[in-house]
Amino acid sequence: MTIATAARSVLLALLTLVSSATCVFADVLVRWDQTQAPSKQVLGITTIVVPGANADAVRHAIAEGYQVYVEVDGANVSGFTPAGTPVHGIVVTGNASDADIAGLRTRLKLPADRVLVAQSGAKWPHIRTNWVTKNNDVLQVTGRSAQPWIENNAALLRILQAERPGRTPLLTYRWQPITRSEIDEGPSLEHYLVAIAEAGSFGGDLVLPLHERFQQRLLAGEAAARSEWIEIRRYLEFYSKDFPTRYRPVVNVGVITSHPMVWFETMNLLARHNVPFEVLTPVQLATRDLKALRLLIVLDQPEGAALDALERFTRGGGKVHKVTAGVSDPNSFAFEIRKLLGADDRVVDIWNGITVLIAPYQSPDTDTVLVTVLNYAYQPLPVQLRVRGTFGAVHYESPDNRREIVPHQHRHGYTEFILPALRVGGRVYLSQRSAGR
């Protein structure tokens, strides 16, 4: 068998692992709540989100020529009319009924895609430092060498994508300061960059709130604030690239549950340990083609036809891990799942990257595999990756680097390579065609 033939065979095997299509870019809307906003020329963006409670801010933003999304709490949707017209759209936060949302669209004569509903439960992504736990009433602080706890939204986005296939979830969250300086000054530049990169890496849209102090510094024209905004805008542009092809997540682990949020922490740790998965309900077991999957994690027990499908999956060589008494330690559970998969069935492996999360995708129209990489520590870090498949070319791009060729090698049906300095986020493209062609 030639190398090219072997490569095509591995690619076909990889293609069987893909699930439903999703976005690998993010529509990030900037939230501005000061009464005045800089001009579009200064910010370099055309659309902003303004709180509906600040009528003067809405009017001023419209007068500046922005396309304005007005933010309204779900409790106030019924009968809401924004100050100033015309508004470009509405962002609803909190809980609102489908009937209230439909009524809002009709009343304001807005198309469905301009009335956006932000999902609750999201967190500003960051690494928790000095994580404190209690053991036998004794407080214990993690050491610097311990696996850091990453607050992230990867699992939440996967759950939301499963609940509404084909629709991109919209997240928003508030900044949670840790130190006194963060209360006064707000997030650092890197916190903004990680937030943008996370949305673009895992297929979510985002309303990005700018801290009050940062907005004031931009209005005052401070040089440092302008410099930081230029970098934020570069990340906005990089992750807003609307690819003509909707990539599909590459997964070979299915999580079976009717109540995913009950099991959120279990899935959160799977995502944390870079185990790509998709969420399936027990009912879907009876109708889905499960050949693509290598392992099913059964959190809610199936019945009837779904149970028969599970038995067929096992007879066909699939692995099943049933949870019958809850998951007391999600972290250990994630390690157990990685071990159960084995090295030969992992889609992606990563070394030297305890603060890095990845997401593999496959183009349905070409032979390209795309892997997003995100370093929550925002410190340049050499990261080694192993991706299933023997690819002829590996390219890397990021907001900080132009597209470049990455040296790679093949080993046991996988392609291995090193990203020498992953600062925040980027994309790796793996294709069958060699770099010189």
Question: Where in this protein do the model-derived segments appear?
Answer:
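Solvent-exposed beta-hairpin/edge-strand motifs
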Residues: 386-402
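N-terminal secretory signal peptides that target proteins for export/translocation
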Residues: 1-7
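C-terminal helix of von Willebrand factor
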Residues: 327-351
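C-terminal beta-strand-rich structural cap/linker in extracellular carbohydrate-active enzymes
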Residues: 321, 411-437
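Bacterial N-terminal signal peptides
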Residues: 9-20
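Extracellular/luminal ectodomains and secreted, surface-exposed scaffolds of diverse proteins
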Residues: 404-412
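Glycan-processing catalytic domains of CAZymes
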Residues: 24-318, 322-330, 414-417
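Carbohydrate-binding surface patches
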Residues: 249-252, 256-274, 291-295, 353-389
